């Protein structure tokens, strides 16, 4: 039987760490930043950890 393909959209958006946590980018920092406060844009930097329930679904999409 052939291997299952991982979900290409999910593989672009999420990353699974060595310990099994799923990381995601925070929403709202792509464009239209001019009216957003510096405090908000700083807060949106870096990766966030997925909630356990959502992480389970994402791992299934990624085949992990």
Curated annotation (Swiss-Prot):
GO terms for molecular function: structural constituent of ribosome. Pfam families: Ribosomal_L35p. Keywords: Ribonucleoprotein, Ribosomal protein. The keyword Ribonucleoprotein applies. This is Large ribosomal subunit protein bL35. Gene3D superfamilies: 4.10.410.60. SUPFAM superfamilies: L35p-like. Belongs to the bacterial ribosomal protein bL35 family. The gene is rpmI. InterPro entries: Ribosomal_bL35, Ribosomal_bL35-like, Ribosomal_bL35_CS, Ribosomal_bL35_sf. It comes from the Bacteria. GO terms for biological process: translation. One of its GO terms (cellular component) is cytosolic large ribosomal subunit.
């Amino acid at each position: 039987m052939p291997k299952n393909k991982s979900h290409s959209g999910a593989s672009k958006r999420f990353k699974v760490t060595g310990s099994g946590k799923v990381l995601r980018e925070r929403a709202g920092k792509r464009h239209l930043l001019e009216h957003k406060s510096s405090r908000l844009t700083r807060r949106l930097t870096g990766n966030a950890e997925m909630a356990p329930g959502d992480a389970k679904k994402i791992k299934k999409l990624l085949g992990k």
